[in-house]
Amino acid sequence: MGYSLVNILGGLLIVTSTIVVVSKTIPSAIKWYAIQSVVLVGVLLTLGLTTGATELLMWAASAFVTKVILVPFILNRAYKKMGSPADSTLTSSIKPAWTIILTGLEVAVCFAVVTRLSLPTAEVATPALAISFAHFFVGLTCIISQRNILKQIFGYCLMENGSHVTLALLAPTAPEIIEIGIATDAIFAVIIMSAVVVRIWNDTKSLDSHDLTELKG
């Protein structure tokens, strides 16, 4: 039952990731990212209880603090500093329907790759492992397709969540210091990227990447 629940939660991860990418407003994307992070915590807890790896329980606690609370808080604070800019509703370069189809293809390709791996985890948690791999491509899709530069930050966050699940599945007994390093990198990356976005907004009053092609350092 343990790995079956992990696979179910993995399915919820890709659903929430897709919703984050197709969300039309920053507040909506923040909300769904927080929901996804709660699901991620559930994956870590379930894996910890299933494998007996107490390290994953610590990972779950760390992920709750950093991903469910801190990252949404930082992104929401950056959004409010810009006075809820109107161009937060900029549409993606890819229509939502095509985004969903592309996400499905990315998961299918990763699933095909995972089924060829001779790893213990690949035998019992194939869907979850494939979905964790697919998050890299889903995040990349978000970064490439979104015109809103604040929305592009979510692409990085999705990629980071995917790497988190991949590590938990492949190395559940890895020392907590590794998790601390991953979480710390993610927090500082989001802080720096958010600060840069706010600075760009203050200088240009635009979050549209199409308007920022002539920015100079």
Regions found by a protein language model. Name each.
Residues 1-217:
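Alpha-helical transmembrane segments of multi-pass membrane proteins predominantly involved
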